[in-house]
């Protein structure tokens, strides 16, 4: 499967992540467990995806027993986190935990129109000022199904002026992930916890893990 994917798509091989993904798929997993599993998977996935970030020296510091050491850090001032409402909110804290300093969070509200399965943007709080444009935008959205929502988010961030986009997703469908990866291949890296082969006629991943937003926010059957 991996050999046929675009080079900017990465599938986690971490055994703990794969085990947690199996737990998340289960219909018996409740909302509290779902929230915890999404967070834990995002931690594991994000750690791999952000391993390329540049480490820089920031002077000297001292340990509690009086020894001097070189203080290393990452410049987070030009990194922004972009959760796709609403289910992307479940992955925000994990990425904030991984990074060594606070980063801005800009929300994108996108939903999929039921008949056409095309994305509709209803909220966008990316700053208008070019001085506030991030170099790296990290999109968090647990599911990439048709890929259209992910494509719309990548387009918005590219137009905003970011240099690079990293997409973190718990689970994707091969057709949707492939489409999203082709939208801006030179500027986008997509990291997924797992991949399923296809979609239902309603655009749901199969076997998938259901509507993750409904599972996170207890709105099943709305």
Named regions from a protein language model:
Residues 1-222:
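PRPP-associated nucleotide enzymes
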């Amino acid at each position: 499967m991996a050999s046929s994917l675009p080079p900017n798509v990465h599938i986690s091989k971490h055994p703990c992540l794969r085990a947690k993904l199996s737990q998340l798929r289960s219909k018996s997993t409740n909302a509290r467990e779902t929230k915890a599993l999404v967070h834990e998977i995002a931690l594991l996935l994000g750690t791999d995806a952000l391993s390329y970030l540049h480490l820089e020296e920031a002077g000297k510091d001292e340990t509690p027993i009086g020894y001097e050491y070189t203080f290393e850090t990452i410049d987070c001032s030009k990194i922004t986190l972009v959760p796709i409402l609403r289910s992307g909110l479940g992955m925000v804290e994990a990425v904030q935990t991984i990074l060594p300093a606070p980063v801005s969070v800009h929300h994108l509200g996108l939903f999929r129109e039921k008949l056409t399965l095309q994305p509709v943007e209803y909220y966008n709080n990316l700053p208008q000022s070019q001085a506030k444009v991030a170099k790296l935008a990290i999109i968090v959205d647990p599911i990439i199904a048709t890929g259209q929502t992910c494509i719309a988010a990548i387009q918005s961030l590219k137009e905003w002026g970011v240099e690079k986009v990293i997409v973190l997703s718990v689970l994707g469908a091969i057709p949707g992930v492939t489409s999203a990866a082709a939208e801006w291949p030179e500027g986008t890296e997509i990291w997924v916890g797992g991949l399923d082969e296809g979609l239902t006629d309603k655009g749901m991943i199969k076997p998938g893990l259901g509507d993750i937003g409904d599972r996170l926010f207890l709105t099943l059957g709305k």
